[in-house]
Amino acid sequence: MTNVLIEDLKWRGLIYQQTDEQGIEDLLNKEQVTLYCGADPTADSLHIGHLLPFLTLRRFQEHGHRPIVLIGGGTGMIGDPSGKSEERVLQTEEQVDKNIEGISKQIHNIFEFGTDHGAVLVNNRDWLGQISLISFLRDYGKHVGVNYMLGKDSIQSRLEHGISYTEFTYTILQAIDFGHLNRELNCKIQVGGSDQWGNITSGIELMRRMYGQTDAYGLTIPLVTKSDGKKFGKSESGAVWLDAEKTSPYEFYQFWINQSDEDVIKFLKYFTFLGKEEIDRLEQSKNEAPHLREAQKTLAEEVTKFIHGEDALNDAIRISQALFSGDLKSLSAKELKDGFKDVPQVTLSNDTTNIVEVLIETGISPSKRQAREDVNNGAIYINGERQQDVNYALAPEDKIDGEFTIIRRGKKKYFMVNYQ
């Protein structure tokens, strides 16, 4: 008997590997299943690289199953070697605690809590911190063969360049997590990225050896790739964070709206809860009227609203429209800084005020002759307003918050002028 959720995950391309495809399907058809996904607190915010595993877990919740979200307060003190070419820098306990605080708030925005299938948030330091070294070696290490661990991709890929015993034992700690959640909270499925396959299967194997447990399964989702070969999850400014202080909702919105025609339908399937009928319609729109970018706008709206809420989405759309139309005066200083974060930053002394000299000193125009031509031809805009007077002097009101001025040359070349 097929399972509606599994069929949906397959259609979305969200299933990479399963330890027992039929076993998982039978289990989901039989009962409300408790399953988990985890993340180590390596920073004080999640980034969009974390989104897909957690959104996949949320899809299970939408179908009546109960998600456990594990934050690795214990494993985060060690460091996961999976997908890393070199040793991680160990974090202090204080830093890990600070990171957990930030991530926990974001988890509450992604999942529903307080219902009969409400999410459960756990920290693995609560049980890993209680295990003594002797207990770790006798009760757990005895059941894990070194040859078995050496066969894991996450270990093999590091042997040539070296791996510490600390990171070598990481997979055992994550295996202990699955066993603990299985016995204490009846958790039967672990969900993770494709790089977590070795850690997931280690947990199932440890349960089998320790408890004779067979009712435990693993499901991984694919690595998110872009059609141009670039790494997903990075903008020109770096990582795209879920924390609005690190990546503003406007920047977040812009990241999604700028996805290519080649990637947008896949990302609609991955990152939104829109159904097949609507996504098929958006695909048709993309094919027939790509200039409208309806699919990209929908992707940006759906993901931004889910993570930041409707008010933040409306602000992001308003900022985008104002920047597109050149109506900069309708925006606050913070909104302008967010909007022009990636444009060239130039510095100007407070003594320079003549528009031609400003253009030369900042390098916006390459020569005095060109600067005068740019102004005379109406190619220069100060904070969105055209300036055609070569004798114009920048006034205090041209400095937004007394800090910066936005100068545009031509149709699309923006510069943020900062003062010293």
Curated annotation (Swiss-Prot):
Pfam families: SYY_C-terminal, tRNA-synt_1b. Keywords: Aminoacyl-tRNA synthetase, ATP-binding, Cytoplasm, Ligase, Nucleotide-binding, Protein biosynthesis, RNA-binding. One of its GO terms (biological process) is tyrosyl-tRNA aminoacylation. Its EC number is 6.1.1.1. L-tyrosine binds at Y36, Y170, Q174. GO terms for molecular function: ATP binding; RNA binding; tyrosine-tRNA ligase activity. The keyword Protein biosynthesis applies. It catalyses: tRNA(Tyr) + L-tyrosine + ATP = L-tyrosyl-tRNA(Tyr) + AMP + diphosphate + H(+). InterPro entries: aa-tRNA-synth_I_CS, aa-tRNA-synth_Ic, Rossmann-like_a/b/a_fold, S4_RNA-bd, S4_RNA-bd_sf, SYY-like_C, Tyr-tRNA-ligase, Tyr-tRNA-ligase_bac-type. Residues 353-420 form the S4 RNA-binding domain. It is found in: Cytoplasm. The keyword Zinc does not apply. Its main location: cytoplasm. A motif ('KMSKS' region) lies at residues 231-235. CDD domains: S4, Tyr_Trp_RS_core. Belongs to the class-I aminoacyl-tRNA synthetase family. TyrS type 1 subfamily. Catalyzes the attachment of tyrosine to tRNA(Tyr) in a two-step reaction: tyrosine is first activated by ATP to form Tyr-AMP and then transferred to the acceptor end of tRNA(Tyr). Homodimer. This is Tyrosine--tRNA ligase. It comes from Staphylococcus aureus (strain COL). The lineage of its organism: Bacteria, Bacillati, Bacillota, Bacilli, Bacillales.
